[in-house]
Amino acid sequence: MSVGNSCIKAFDFARCHVMVERGLSREECEGYVMKEIDFYMVDAFSTETFGGNAAAVCPLIEWLPDETLLKMSQQHNQSETAFFVTTDSGFELRWFTTQGEINLCGHATLAAAHVIFEYLDYPDTTIRFETRFVGPLAVTRSGDWLTLDFPGWDSEPVLPPPLLLEGLGISDYQQVRVARDYMVVLESQQQVEALRPDIHAMIPLGKMVCVTAPGEGEYDFVSRFFCPGEAVAEDPVTGSAHSMLIPYWADKLNKTQMLARQVSARSGDLRCQLVVDRVRIGGQATTYLIGKVLLR
């Protein structure tokens, strides 16, 4: 324990002792004692600082009230914060944005697994997470790579809403599909990279927007992911979007193992595999910050 933490604990103990002497119950006193929570900020899907997609990660002893988790996420001011608690079978995992809890987040799952493997003396090569909305998830480590095992999502072709094309600023496209999000397929990587969308104009769509195209060089496909109505206009690297992208490109390219790149400003590489109705999404991660959250 550091000197600073020792001083904090000593101060809280002394303050609690005084309150008890003044007639407060031990339970009332505990409400004034500071809680210490480990805090990590991790760049997921990258080996370089400021690359990939940043996520905050907080291991918890037990679940805090949802209101507290949301306020913590707002204070962290990252696109997502991953919270987890240890269970008999593994870990229970939840994700919060600055606006509320979400059903799935790939890069924050990768970041949480990175923290468990690197800092919590986890002995196995596979982590099993229980989640509230998408069931069990697994993350496996092999060397420096972490592989997410996520559900695959089939998408259906649709006629594009005019607001979608107008917001993206395009008239030519190969196909528009929909699953959890809209998926717009373009002809080339250059077209995806050149997009300058009007994010605000797409808010009435009520969905996130993924744009994809065949990749160049070693990459089988590329993508970008836009978030109308969210705090972050463009998500730098979106693991969960590949639950939709991998089944599509596996069918299109007639291959089950692929290398993908999300061509945002921060960018990131993803190893992709389709296994029946599941997808495996591989990435690397690097720690940017380690600290303490102090709650009263």
Predicted regions and their residues:
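Short, low-complexity, intrinsically disordered N-terminal peptides in bacterial proteins
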Residues: 26-36
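Extreme N-terminal basic, low-complexity initiation segments
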Residues: 2-9
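Aromatic (phenylalanine/tyrosine) cluster motif
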Residues: 11-13, 32
